[in-house]
C-alpha cells in the first residue's frame, strides 16, 4: 500500500491509512540497518516507565555514569 509523505512545520509526516491506525498515544520510531523506518506502538506501561526518566537532570546522569568507573570491591569469600 502506498501513502503520502508531507511537511508538517519543520518535520516530515506520513499519512497513515485507516487500516493501520494506532490505538495508542505514543509510537516508537527507529531505522533498521537496511534503512527501513519502523513505527511501533508503545504500550501504556512502557510509556509510563519511560516517563519516569524524563525528570532526571544532567547532574544525576553524570553521577550514574561515574559509578561505572569505580573499581570492583574486594570482599571476603563466603
From Swiss-Prot:
InterPro entries, sorted: SpoVT-AbrB_dom, SpoVT-AbrB_sf, VapB_TA_antitoxins
Pfam family, one: MazE_antitoxin
Stimuli inducing this protein: More highly expressed in early growth phase, expression decreases as cell density decreases. Part of the vapB1-vapC1 operon.
Residues of the SpoVT-AbrB domain: 3-44
Superkingdom as given in the UniProt entry: Bacteria
Gene Ontology molecular function: any one: DNA binding
Annotated phenotype, changing residue 67 to G: No effect on antitoxin function against VapC1
Protein's UniProt keywords contain DNA-binding: yes
Alphabetized UniProt keyword annotations: DNA-binding, Toxin-antitoxin system
The keyword Aminoacyl-tRNA synthetase is annotated on this UniProt entry: no
Entry similarity comment: Belongs to the VapB family.
Subunit annotation: Forms a complex with VapC1, and a weak complex with VapC2.
Function, as annotated: Antitoxin component of a type II toxin-antitoxin (TA) system. Neutralizes the effect of cognate toxin VapC1 but not non-cognate toxin VapC2.
Protein name (record): Antitoxin VapB1
Biological source species: Haemophilus influenzae (strain 86-028NP)
Gene expressing this chain: vapB1
